[in-house]
Design a protein with these regions (language model features):
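Transmembrane beta-strand segments that form the barrel wall of outer-membrane beta-barrel proteins
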Residues: 131-141, 164-176, 414-427
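Acidic, small-polar-rich N-terminal luminal/periplasmic segments of exported/outer-membrane proteins
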Residues: 21-129
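Exposed, low-structure sequence patches enriched in small/polar residues
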Residues: 14, 128-130, 244-307, 312, ...
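Outer-membrane beta-barrel translocator/channel fold
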Residues: 82-85, 176-184, 190-255, 446-466
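Short strand-turn segments of transmembrane beta-barrel domains in outer membranes
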Residues: 105-111, 119-153, 175-176
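Outer-membrane beta-barrel proteins
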Residues: 38, 140-142, 171-190, 244-253, ...
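Single conserved hydrophobic/aromatic residue that forms the stacking wall/gate
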Residues: 1-16
Length: 466
């Protein structure tokens, strides 16, 4: 069952910001250089776009407005052909297809909720001619295992340059097993300022996810051989299956502040066309761009249990609390500076070239070991401490400098490509290497559009902190 509401009303057009460069303003501009930008569709009332990693290049992101099978969009299976998860919407999930798995975060506890977390690469930005509102509500399941999801987005333009908006996503799922429910809340405020010479996209987001934990079933035969345990019952409620523990929660919280901006350098070219008043039209020709991106993340994780039975699952306990209360947190600040030569910056150059440097600072906070407590050769506590004067946490700092470059061709249909390389130059991740690329070609096949696309990467990276 689903309810959907969509209201449309405000709009602006993304300006053409990637016209190719001409070495002289007196030269004629070929028609190929006057084609619309990949993120400029002036005929549409609403345009949705996303940003490329680190550099913030805008590209069109299709907006799903199809009502056919809309209810399936909430299902976890809508994210991949094969997903492993805990039966209900909002539970930790991971795709089973290798090439769909993303590089793990240093804060690995958020990886299990990747489908529900907004990042700079999956965040939507908008350009509207009329105010736009979309509210969706989906629900499913019986009263004992009901799942509800409410999503909404509101955005509008102020003139042709400024767009602001906000969105929220709320999931409440009771789960199909004992101690299997979850509650997820996330929201985001975003905005953009786009002119020929200056572009800015920014957002701040926050999420708070709470997930009940049960450690799994005590007997897998309830799933593998349910008839053997039915005891002459036709149906057994899955909520009655015995689990390893209850009264246990896993809370993951996070916030993010993201801003990317660029200043385009170039010149103004007069066209042969005139406006309604008879003035000669002018178009800005960008040659290069100076780019700055700042990304700050703050994440926290807390694992709480009031069930004494959890001691049978985790034989080694850390700390002196009567109940389990494990906490950790981290933050990282990433600054990227880049210089880009726009695609077609010379008549012979049918590609764009970008060089960048990234400075990343990370801090992790863990519960400290108790002085006087014998942790043994494996680090596990085995005796009472001799003192209670001990710090509550320990802090670990990391810093890394990366350099990299990108070669891309995003215009045209016959052949487009993008190749990016990144090297950890100094610091905690010195020696890290990332090389990734994609290639796409389009052609006619039996009078139909056909596309062939290839992707690949080579990585040599350090393990996540945890």
């Amino acid at each position: 069952y689903e309810i959907s509401a969509c209201l449309v009303g405000s709009e602006m057009c993304i300006r053409d910001s990637s016209l190719s460069n001409l070495s002289s303003s007196n030269k004629e501009i070929p028609d190929s250089l006057l084609q619309t930008d990949s993120a400029a569709l002036k005929s549409k009332r609403i345009i949705g776009y996303r940003l490329t990693p680190l550099l913030g290049e805008r590209y069109i992101a299709p907006m799903d407005t199809n009502r056919l099978n809309f209810g399936n969009s909430t299902l976890v299976e809508a994210n991949s052909l094969a997903v492993g998860y805990l039966a209900n919407v909002g539970s930790p999930a991971q795709t089973r297809i290798f090439n769909e798995r993303k590089e793990e975060r240093d804060f690995i506890f958020a990886d299990a909720y990747d489908y529900y977390i907004t990042t700079p690469t999956n965040a939507y930005f908008y350009d509207t001619k009329v105010p736009y509102t979309q509210v969706t509500y989906t629900t499913g399941g019986a009263s004992q295992n009901k799942m509800d999801r409410l999503k909404g987005v509101l955005t509008m333009n102020f003139g042709k340059k400024i767009n602001v908006g906000g969105e929220m996503d709320y999931i409440y799922s009771r789960g199909y097993y004992n101690s299997n429910g979850n509650k997820l809340l996330s929201y985001r405020f975003f905005g953009s300022y786009i002119t020929d010479r200056y572009e800015l996209n920014a957002y701040l987001s926050n999420f708070n996810f709470v997930n009940y934990e049960n450690g799994g079933l005590t007997n897998d035969q309830y799933i593998t051989n349910p008839d053997d345990l039915a005891e002459n019952q036709r149906n057994i409620d899955s909520k009655s299956y015995p689990v390893r523990y209850t009264d246990t929660w896993n809370r993951v919280r996070g916030k993010q502040y993201f801003l990317t901006q660029r200043y385009n350098l170039g010149f103004t070219k007069e066209l042969e066309e005139t406006d309604e008043e008879g003035n000669v039209k002018e178009v800005f020709i960008p040659v290069s761009s100076i780019i700055h991106t700042i990304d700050y993340e703050d994440n926290r994780r807390r694992f709480i249990s009031n069930d004494a039975g959890i001691d049978t699952c985790y034989t080694h306990l850390y700390g002196m609390d009567a109940s389990l209360n494990d906490q950790t947190s981290s933050w990282n600040l990433k600054n990227t500076f880049a210089l880009a030569l726009r695609e077609g910056f010379q008549d012979w150059a049918k590609f764009g070239l970008t060089a960048f440097v990234t400075f990343e600072k990370r801090r992790f906070r863990l519960a400290s070991q108790v002085p006087g407590l014998d942790y043994g050769p494996d680090g596990h506590g085995s005796s009472e401490p001799s003192t209670l004067n001990f710090p509550t946490s320990e802090v670990y700092d990391e810093f890394t400098t990366y350099i990299g470059g990108e070669l891309s061709k995003r215009r045209g249909s016959l052949l487009t490509y993008n190749v990016r390389g990144e090297l950890g130059l100094a610091g905690s991740d010195a020696g890290e290497v990332r090389v990734s690329g994609d290639l796409q070609t389009k052609f006619k096949l039996f009078k139909k559009d056909a596309t062939i696309k290839a992707e690949g990467y080579i990585k040599n990276i350090t393990p996540a902190f945890y």
